[in-house]
Design a protein with these regions (language model features):
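Negatively charged, low-complexity tracts enriched in Asp/Glu with abundant Ser/Thr
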Residues: 1-20, 53, 58, 62-66
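Acidic, low-complexity, intrinsically disordered interaction modules
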Residues: 17-60
């Protein structure tokens, strides 16, 4: 999956979970996402997005938020 598709998917999932996307960057092939969770805390998650399916990304985000 390309970076732009993964980022768009992550933004959509965060929006459904009432979270706010802040920024993203790539380091060594890993997509690092910063966002505000439902309680207003800043969170950071890392995704090896090239090797993940849409379902895997969604599960990682849900586990990270809750």
């Amino acid at each position: 999956m390309c970076k732009f598709k993964a980022e768009r998917l992550i933004k959509d999932i965060l929006e459904r979970l009432h979270c706010r996307f802040i920024c993203s960057k790539i380091e060594d092939g890993i997509l690092i996402i910063r966002y505000l969770d439902t309680w207003g805390n800043t969170r950071k998650d890392c995704f090896p997005y090239r090797y993940m399916s849409e379902g895997d990304i969604e599960n990682m985000i849900i586990n990270g938020v809750y």
